[in-house]
Amino acid sequence: NASFNGDYADLGAWTFSSFFTGLSLPPANDGMPGVRNISGEISTSNPGEFVVDLDTHYATLYFPGIFRHPQMNFSSITGRVSAALHSTPKFTFTDITAVSDDGTVRGSGTWESTGGAGTINISGTAEGVNGAAVHKYLPIVVGDPALDYVEAAVLAGRVSTGRWEVRGKLDDFPWNGAAPQEGHFLIEGDVTDGRMDFMPSRRAVTRSGRTQWAQGEHWPLLTNIVGRMHFEGNRMTITGNSA
């Protein structure tokens, strides 16, 4: 649907709204995310400003170069994205809720074009998250040692409630926490029914030299863990209250 008020040749006089379904955009070579099967409604009432209300089911987001597992599948994505494409483009995310087999994540915040990869300020909560899947949502820049350890050590668990925050210039990510005013990266949550291998090791399992994590070789597995996972900046802390 489209309408205009005044001179039809003046794009600023136009307003429109439209529904879209199954929108797919491949990831770009410069690392821009891609999407598949996104649905919702887009509208505008002011020049250079757009509002997208998401109502998506069974969609995929692609984050090449950001996560080890760049393809993320979701059973639903809802919420509002507002775009102001003026001299300094800015996107505002409101009540975004993403549901997958790994849990439910909610968030709100902004991204602003401030040069380079821009500046982000987004935070939210997580519910019912599979602890063994946490490594999939830690960005590559956290470093291979940390990613390897989390993937191998955290074998099971349920994060009933958690929170997360990403704030600062993305070119400086991951912020090490020494100067919180420059940027902050945080993921933390309480874990129940956890299972963990504190000293995982790799070993060859085929003639080709392929390796996998060997569980419990150096230390007995801990089970029925109740504790807390805390990732902040480039640091990681896992605290067990009982096991």
Where are these regions (language model features)?
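Membrane-proximal interfacial segments on either side of biological membranes
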Residues: 1-73, 77-80, 84-92, 103-243
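Short strand-coil-strand connectors
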Residues: 99-101
